Amino acid sequence: PALVGKRWAEDLMAGMGWRFDPITGHVSEDLKRIRYLAQNAGAAKGLLFPNSLGSALLFKFGQIESAGLTTDCRSLLLSEKIPEPPKCHEVERFFHVAHEAIKAWGGTPAWDKVPKNLGLLLLKRHEAAAKNLMEKYSIPKRYAVLAPIARGLQDGQNKCWAHFNDLVGPLRNIGIEPIVFPNKE
C-alpha cells in the first residue's frame, strides 16, 4: 500500500515499509502528488480515514476512487459510501471503515473484529527514543498514557473528555503511573 497523510504520520508508519506521501496543505502540490500516485504508482483506490471534506475533494480531483465515511457532506465525492457506525472507540470506527471498504471493493477482510494487536511495527530508533525518555523522566514499567488532546466539537459535544484528572488517583492506587500530556486549551 501507499499511504497519504499528514506529515506527522510518516514517522509513525515508518516501520511498516510502505510508501508514504505527505499532504502538506498546499492544494496544488497535494493534488499533483495524488495525481502522480494515481497515474504512476498503481494507486487506483483510496481509503479515507479523516472526516474532512478536503481529503475527499483531493482524491476526487486526483482521480482516485475513494471509500470513506459519509460525514461532512462527503457522500457526493466518494465512490464507496460507508455509513457511520454506531458509537464506538475511534480504533473500532476506523477499523469499520477499512473493513467495509475491503468488502465494497470485492475483497475479504482478514478480520471481522478489531484484533488485539494492530501490527504496527516500530523502528529501532523508535524503541531507543522511548527507552531514553523513560529513563530521563523515571517512567516505571507500569504506566498509562492520558492524552486529552482532542479539540473542538463532535455532534455538538466537546471531543475532549473532561475527567482525565479523575483517573490519576485510581491508577496510582493500583500501581500504574499516569503520564499526562496536557491539552493546550
Task: Label every model-predicted segment.
Residues 1-185:
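Catalytic machinery of carbohydrate-active enzymes
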